[in-house]
Amino acid sequence: FINYATTLLAAADASVGGKTAVDTPLATNLIGLFNQPEKVYLDIAAWKTLPQRQLSSGMAETIKHACMADKEMFEFLEKHMEDIFAGDREACEYIAKKNCQIKYAVVMKDEKEQGLREILNLGHTVGRAIETVSDYRLLHGEALSIGMVAMTELAHRLGYMTEEEKTAVKNLLEKAKLPVEIPEYIDREALVKKLYTDKKVRDGKLRFVVEKGIGGIVEFEEGVFATPVEEAVARDIIMKMK
């Protein structure tokens, strides 16, 4: 098949990687298979037709890529967010190529998520849980944005991000017109329970991918990019988020 991406979210996320999955009431992305497209086309002209909310949703995955792998890209987004939203071709081409390059580099080393590919789940432990608990009222990128804020707090507590770096990520998400707080209608106890449907859970233990500074990921031991986190810690972070 050919993947023709007409949204920023598809360009940043689904177009490269080969995951073909379905969402269920239980959770997202648990039922599916790996099937690589023969070709991928990114139609950045179509981005101009998107509502602001949809464009922002795609920007969350773009920011995630910058956070995990490319500080220069992060700084570009800080300077050119308005240009991207205005449809500036050069800025849009830059992020389209960067998204593909970053994700392709990971997927080609670990197509079926045996280790390295877990880094693409940065922010998704809380993000996917809140997306489901919201009954999909939150778009994927909106939920991911909140998950990124939770992740940076964890990274800060573990000593991998400074307060300034944590704030920089939050500020960039806000600049992209993304939510950074848990909506009042979300049942936080239900959110904590939903964390356990995450595909990174092992032996009943929550596991998180953790950012290192801006543009890096913590490798906890050789080939291991997710670390167990006690429920009490995850709960405390969630309960203290506004």
Where are these regions (language model features)?
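A glycine/threonine-rich phosphate-anchoring loop and its flanking beta-alpha core
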Residues: 1-82
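Short glycine/serine/threonine-biased micro-segments
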Residues: 15-16, 30, 56, 121, ...
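Residues in well-ordered beta-strands of folded domains
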Residues: 23, 100, 209
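A generic hydrophobic-helix recognition signal that picks specific residues
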Residues: 29, 36, 116-117, 206
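Structural motif
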Residues: 49-54, 89-90, 137-140, 201
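C-terminal charged capping/lid subdomain of soluble metabolic enzymes
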Residues: 60-62, 160-242
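Active-site segments that bind and position negatively charged phosphate/pyrophosphate groups
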Residues: 75-190
